[in-house]
Swiss-Prot record:
It holds the Pfam family Ribosomal_L33. Belongs to the bacterial ribosomal protein bL33 family. GO terms for cellular component: cytoplasm; ribonucleoprotein complex; ribosome. The keyword Ribosomal protein applies. This is Large ribosomal subunit protein bL33. GO terms for biological process: translation. The keyword Ribonucleoprotein applies. Keywords: Ribonucleoprotein, Ribosomal protein. GO terms for molecular function: structural constituent of ribosome. Signal peptide: none annotated.
Length: 59
């Protein structure tokens, strides 16, 4: 059983570090519940500290 490739409410997004620009994390987001872009404080392994990560598209 494969996943459907339609336009569902849940989408896969990447979290991009604001200081380095590297995509460190991937997560899912429900578009019906959250319309604005996701912003989280996450650990950046390059800088070895917690930085702001914003939602970006997965290539």
């Amino acid at each position: 059983m494969g996943k459907k490739k339609g336009k569902g409410a849940v989408e896969l997004i990447a979290l991009v570090c604001e200081e380095t620009g590297i995509r460190n994390y991937t997560t899912t987001k429900n578009r019906r519940n959250k319309q604005e872009k996701l912003e989280l404080m996450k650990y950046c392994p390059i800088l070895r500290k917690h930085t702001l990560h914003k939602e970006g598209k997965i290539k």
